[in-house]
């Protein structure tokens, strides 16, 4: 058989028992020429089936060709959009603004074509650009007057973050329009520049649909720093009514302040409930049984948490954790004025009071001030006349236990602090410094200062 000949297939004759006549040969609907041809026959243009858009009364079905690349063959309706509670536009204005790119088109069933009209607010001279909001005349558009070949898509809503005085975040909505470009957002027309970091312009340019102020929580912005609605040409385009938001925020702040103030009152807790856990020894009241349990070692003297390095005991585990830093010899917190280093930042803050001359703790009896609360409490014992710490050798009494500890060095001849000039030993570093100021500092510049002294331990 030649290659140019048409392919033919012979159907075998029917069984003679069936009583059928012999079958004739049939030519197929395709050939080798058509298969090897470079060009294909054009497809017939798409013609929708008549009545496809109409509901079938018997079956109640519609032709929804949503996934087809061809135009959607369903009646065009405005898409539903749920507007937030504090949006700047009503639904009607939002719907009209979504039509600003295509116009109102002719009347009837799509007689005006697809988007042949002018923008909604093109005749307005007050607006910076075609925002679709400031048109004076109401534009009444019926669903039948919409263009026949265009899908109505709701306007994109962006979110920006504002930080009122209370520190809580408010999300303001504004239309994705060029009426307020990103440069005006960054220059403080909508939000103060204090909320923006150095990388904000690049982030806004890269992601214009999502602009999140990451440093909003860290910026303590007051209520008076918020922009006022007066400088805006369109008050309805503000990112929410700021006065109302700030008013609600002020009420919330006052309510929270009232709860905090109530917790500071005697006999009140953070949740407003009275404290009903009382210490039987000193009469101190607590709002939780756990706090009372932590308080009881003050009277019993129990120190269950013991340091494994030095053997010192503590009433609480947190105090033991802070104590362990002493044995690590790490002092990351340094004073900028004298260069002295400390283990904890709280100790550095207390040390800074010495340079500032700030003594917040003042004795009620003699008026002497102290930088630290511990020194203030120890000083008050001198006015009470009570000396409960006594030496077992000479029966000398002391107000504080560390004074007794240093006193015991006089009996065992331990003087760990030695003067580098004269070699005299002292039990306390305080006594050594006083010795140097009194005798050696007035001799001349060659005399060593307290910083040149070394501490030696004598057996």
Swiss-Prot record:
Task: Supply the Gene3D superfamilies for this chain.
Answer: Classic Zinc Finger
Keyword vocabulary terms for this entry: Developmental protein, Differentiation, DNA-binding, Metal-binding, Neurogenesis, Nucleus, Repeat, Repressor, Transcription, Transcription regulation, Zinc, Zinc-finger
Q: Where are the zinc fingers (C2H2-type)?
A: 277-299, 305-327, 333-355, 361-383, 389-411, 417-440
Any Gene Ontology biological process: regulation of gene expression
| UniProt main location, coarse | nucleus
Give a Pfam family name: zf-C2H2_6
Q: Where in the cell is it found?
A: Nucleus
Annotated family: Belongs to the krueppel C2H2-type zinc-finger protein family.
Report what the protein is called: Fez family zinc finger protein 2
Originating species = Homo sapiens
Gene (UniProt): FEZF2
